[in-house]
Amino acid sequence: MSTYVAACNIEAGKAGIVFQNSEQATMTAKNNTIKVTIGGSSTGIKIIATNSNAGNYMIKGNVIEAANGNGITVNFAKSATIVDNMIKLSGNTTSGISLTGCDSSTVSCNTVSGRYPAVSYQNRGIYGSMNQKCYISCNTTDSLYKGVHFSSSNIATKFRGNEMKKHYIGLYLDNTAVIDTQTHAGNRWTGTYNSTYGAWNENDSSIFNSSKTILIYC
């Protein structure tokens, strides 16, 4: 049986929509307006997949405001599609979109914005950890502590055509991060960065330019 949640107006303390299934059906969240308000573990839309993963999740065209927690979290899913969502991090939040342990999933054409530097919350627009063969493209992040943060292994991840505006750091790779080789990726750094670094790699800071830059390769 498929599940389709669309055009709903949801205000919740902990979670707006949660998909947790046995991978036997398609689950779609589309064109919803969601606000979550309470606690660091709050999530606008949350996907929790199981081991026998058939790739059946679509999160598209949602407008999410997170006063706490995360906008969208996707854990251990295969071929999940997260596209055309608009996420505002209005409070002491963690991430706009968090992708962890996923395989062959797409995060594309999303916009994540916050309130940095007016407030000093150390949040992230997009966070990726322990993924493989994922495609992160054409997203825009603005007014967040970190635009995009990679941690741990993200083998064969493609990071292309993303725009990072005003942040403390636009793109951050911590000392465990691996995202594989990126060639002619077309990412853009179009804002100012209070750290003076548009991008920073804890493993090798020399490969990135500092201050306000527009880069073609990453």
Regions found by a protein language model. Give the residues of each.
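Glycine-rich beta-solenoid repeat tracts in large extracellular/virion proteins
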Residues: M1, A15-S22, G40-N51, N70-F76, ...
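Right-handed parallel beta-helix
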Residues: S2-A12, Q24-I38, A54-A67, K78-G91, ...
